[in-house]
Amino acid sequence: MNKIRTRYAPSPTGFLHIGGARTALFCYLFAKHFNGDFIFRLEDTDVKRNVEGGEASQLENLAWLGIIPDESPLKPNLKYGKYRQSEKLDRYKEVLDMLLEKNLAYKAYDLPEELEAQKLESEQKGFASFRYDPSWLKISDEEKAKRDLNNQFSYRIRMPKDKVFSWNDLVRGEISFSSNEISDWVIFKSDNYPTYNFAVVVDDHDMQISHVLRGEEHIGNTPKQLALYDYLNWSSPQYGHLTIITDMGGKKLSKRDLSLKQFIEDYKNEGYIPHAIFNFLALLGWTSEDAKEVMSKKELISKFNPARLSKSPSKFDVNKMSWFSKIYMKNQSNEEVQSHLDFKDFNSNSSWKEIFTSTFKESATTYLELQKALNNYLNPMSSELVLNEEELKVVKEFKANLKSFTVEEIQAAINLTASNLKLKGKALFMPIRKACTYLEHGPELAKAIYLFGEKLITERLAKYEN
């Protein structure tokens, strides 16, 4: 069997989107499961939409997730040519010339306004969808020569008639299209750049891509690409078209929807655990046979079976992603967690750091959340919290019961306060937490108090002396 080779081929038009990250991840898992190669290449021929730094952003965010390509523009294998489309224009022109020589493609002189007029006529005749008619435009050879000089032309493929293009989709099973449903389409634009459907075929062939996993919006592109493979007498890869990702209401994710953070960069900046997102994305349209959810990268690679890719849309549940991050945070070593935190010039002994980390990582979702908790100890805030009469009674009792300043003695004082005042739950803990930490929520109370240090807690409790 030939080596499995998959690819993720984004355009450098912005940050790595959740949808793109999932596609890259599935391609990566597929390749690694079969001991193959995962390739990153760049579709950068749409110059107007390219964003400076877009390529670096894509690669950096993939690396942060743990998706490392075997080949990329930064790690090329010269055997497979260039990894940026903008560097392959001569190669595309070479393939275009092959098609022109065989009369499988032709030059089309339609101006944009002429195409619009043809579409309008098609609508008026009652056709459901527009199909380009190469015989519609009637212009003289003189006009053609003029348009040649002004680069007012494109190249179109001559689609075959009465041919069925079909493939066994890795996700959806058998899919077929009649060539009669597809009009001659543009393969080279007037700016001398190839179109997506043309360039992607050349790239996949040159890089010997064996399997393509991509979004379902590309289903309609596949028969066009298969036509090119036929004309060029090349073997096509196997295709699989992933279902859409929706929000929790079932609406397809849109980059224009600013109410939902949809870019990996957002979650990276918030301090999510990278592998938590890796794990979460792997289950966004795929399940393991044993229905296990929390899995290492090694497990996911081992268990990845493309036959278990979902045929139904997947919901992007931020709460579920946070759940994964919380689990991975909890299971990380204190040393690993501390490496992501800025203790500034804090010179306390290592046991303080250990207690802080052990206490707060139990309930934290992100490193940013942990850093905010740490900052509260490094730069203690003043309080505007007001205690009522019942709460004051609890705090005074706690203060009277606190004999020495250790975690164990603080807990003993809390327990004795509960016993003496016959209190439990919020009525017991909230007044003590507010008086000592100036917060209404937090982790295990005795440790949260201890971490502020005896001097500061003594000062805070002194406010509540008789």
Swiss-Prot record:
Enzyme class of the recorded protein, top EC level: ligase
Chemical reaction(s) catalysed: tRNA(Glu) + L-glutamate + ATP = L-glutamyl-tRNA(Glu) + AMP + diphosphate
Short motif ('KMSKS' region): ranges: 252-256
EC number: 6.1.1.17
Subcellular location: Cytoplasm
Binding, ATP: 255
Any one of the GO BP annotations: glutamyl-tRNA aminoacylation
GO cellular component: cytosol
Entry keyword set: Aminoacyl-tRNA synthetase, ATP-binding, Cytoplasm, Ligase, Nucleotide-binding, Protein biosynthesis
Job of this protein: Catalyzes the attachment of glutamate to tRNA(Glu) in a two-step reaction: glutamate is first activated by ATP to form Glu-AMP and then transferred to the acceptor end of tRNA(Glu).
Subunit structure: Monomer.
Protein family per UniProt: Belongs to the class-I aminoacyl-tRNA synthetase family. Glutamate--tRNA ligase type 1 subfamily.
Protein name from the UniProt record: Glutamate--tRNA ligase
Organism whose genome encodes this protein: Mycoplasmopsis synoviae (strain 53)
